[in-house]
Amino acid sequence: MSKTVNAYAKINLALFITGKLPNGYHTLETIFAPINWYDRLTFEPSETIEMACTNAELPTDDSNLCIKAAKRLQTESGSQKGVKISLEKNVPFGAGLGGGSSDAAATLNALNELWELSLPSETLHKLATELGADVPYFLEMPALALGTGIGEELTDLQVAFPFSIVTVFPETAISTAWAYQNFKQNFDRLLPDAATEIQIVCETGDLGRMQQFENDFESIVYENYAEVKKLRDDFVEAGSGFTRLSGSGSAVFGVFADDEKATACYEAMRKRYPTSLTPKSFKMK
């Protein structure tokens, strides 16, 4: 028995870095939103745990999050079953879109089913958090969610995002570690109530309220990557009602209330860079 699934990417509508823990991790407050840009993973029975990928630049050894996820499941469950994972890689990496984390979450879910483990959601959440801060979001949430802690403490906001989203990867990879080492700390400021504000935005359609949503990586990224800053400016010229960097970059997204403007922007951007168009009220599941 084999199984094929889509592993969707995400953007961060807001990303506030709120502190630093003794272990070196940063705490944050973020609003996750899914986008219609996805990898496809096929899982087939095998004697061992092995992996193939359509992108030769992506390692398929023990450093890959999918392999790590499968081996963590083996250890946790005591299962001796194997799997061949075939990854059709479409979501760019080094983009701030969470592609690797989404692939890991898809692996946890798929193998819990295929290996007939029936591990409870609490155990899967623990494994997901060990793999990466974004992995629990992809494992558990269908759409808009508030992330706190290091991003693993999740609240399903239970509202549809009534706007189209155009997301562009400017073919520049940015290291998350570099971004965390160099962003401008401002832990003492007063933050908006992001969960309440995004719910109001979704109910009223008032995109203007989103201007208070910041991404704390933007200033350092725009200072050091002129092509990423130029992409932001291009979105504004295209009529985006809200434009931000996603994660630590380098992907930039624009939010549109007008479907025609969104489609026109998408058609123009995709001539230059890898681009996705996400319809209104999009959900991963």
Swiss-Prot record:
Molecular functions (GO terms): 4-(cytidine 5'-diphospho)-2-C-methyl-D-erythritol kinase activity; ATP binding
SUPFAM superfamilies, per database record: GHMP Kinase, C-terminal domain, Ribosomal protein S5 domain 2-like
GO biological process: isopentenyl diphosphate biosynthetic process, methylerythritol 4-phosphate pathway; terpenoid biosynthetic process
Entry's EC annotation: 2.7.1.148
Residues forming coiled coils: none
PANTHER family: 4-DIPHOSPHOCYTIDYL-2-C-METHYL-D-ERYTHRITOL KINASE, CHLOROPLASTIC
Protein name: 4-diphosphocytidyl-2-C-methyl-D-erythritol kinase
